[in-house]
Amino acid sequence: MLKINFLGDSITEGCCTSGTQHTFVYLVGKMLNAETRNYGVGGTRIAPQTKKSLEPIWDLDFIQRAKKMNHDADYIFVFGGTNDYGHGDAPFGKIGDKTPDTFCGAVDYLINYLLQHYKKEQIIFIPPLHRANEDSPYGDGSRTSPANILKVYSDVLVDIVKSYDIKIFDMKEEMGPGENNPLFEDGLHPNDLGHQKMAELLVDYIKKL
């Protein structure tokens, strides 16, 4: 049986769906008759947070959780970055950073960790979906000083991933804008219809791997 790990945030976890059976992770497993593992935790970021969040679980960044994944998966999908833009306080950094002190460095560090446990052909990154207010330099409104907009986070993630010749599966255009979209519940999180759409896109992609 095919085994697939999904490392992500609240979208992967299934926030704003009506139940586990409506999450894209569950649906992919059902549609492919595969074992899918949901390593999504709401509020989490790829990069470590400097200032502690109200809930400790929100600070379990992707790097920490990647180390706790079951390593026998056939494929690993990493779906994140929107919270780094939204409310992450790690400096953005630059391409070439190798330590997780910056967003760029955390992406690089995560890739190198995954490459120690999986072949690069098994790893796929999913850039952030569109979201409401994605052009605001203040993220979700919690930033006290302006920073990069979502597109800059997404573009640099793609650039770093591609520099390792690792696959990117980008479904943001197929999913459409975060606002005034029947696939989204609140401008950020897809609803049941949105998760069904993501599952269908992922299944089509996985079948071609």
Regions inferred by a protein language model and the residue ranges of each:
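A short, surface-exposed helix-loop junction/capping segment
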Residues: 7-8, 138
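Conserved SGNH/GDSL esterase-like catalytic core that processes O-acyl groups on lipids
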Residues: 2-5, 13-101, 105
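Residue-level preference for alpha-helix termini and adjacent loops
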Residues: 10, 45-46, 182-183, 187
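Ser/Thr-glycine-rich phosphate-binding loops at phosphate-binding pockets of nucleotides
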Residues: 9-12, 191
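Residue-level detector of flexible, active-site-proximal loop/helix-junction positions
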Residues: 11, 42-45, 130, 175
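Alpha-helical cap/lid subdomain in secreted, periplasmic
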Residues: 60-209
